[in-house]
Amino acid sequence: VRDASYIAANMRAEDFREIACLWKHWDTRALGVCAVETAVPGMAWSVWYDGQPAAAFGFSRASAFDPEHWQAWAFGTDRFRRCVPQLTRHVLGFRSRIERDCRRLQVITLKDHDIAHRWIEALGARREGLLRSYGRGGEDFWIYAWVRRHAVTETTGCPGASGQDGRKASWE
């Protein structure tokens, strides 16, 4: 919580514009607590650069009733860009767990945050649509997602998650 709160208090302008517009009352400490406390167990991290916390990122449950539906999040200080290679390697290192435990991983991002869009797309997410007036001030956001394709079971005709019906699911 300490790292995430520090990063939130020293957040770069792009991330502040993207995140603060979602809050009725902006609070950097509350963001740090929310980021860590709502994370999927073991799925919240911070990256330090030059002796200070510089980036926070992770996955939270996007739905209270669907443990396989996750929301990705990341924010950082002005040194965030220097952390992107390490963030990317770290996330890719968890790919097998993400593919196993998560049916849908989504991320929302401010419509004009084009640097974030390029990184998200490079990681393989697909842009699904525009969330009009998603921000409290009328800001539009894009929603991106990675979605696990389920194999259909022969006996029930219902989708089965990877490992539940003996078939391997893939991501798109």
PLM region descriptions:
Residues 51-56, 67-70, 139:
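Glycine-rich phosphate/pyrophosphate-binding loop shared by adenosine-nucleotide-utilizing enzymes
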Residues 67-81, 86-87, 142:
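Conserved acetyl-CoA binding element of GNAT-fold acetyltransferases
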Residues 83-97, 118, 122:
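Conserved acetyl-CoA-binding loop-helix of GNAT-fold acetyltransferases
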Residues 105-121, 126, 134-135:
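Conserved beta-strand-loop-alpha-helix junction that forms the acyl-donor binding cleft
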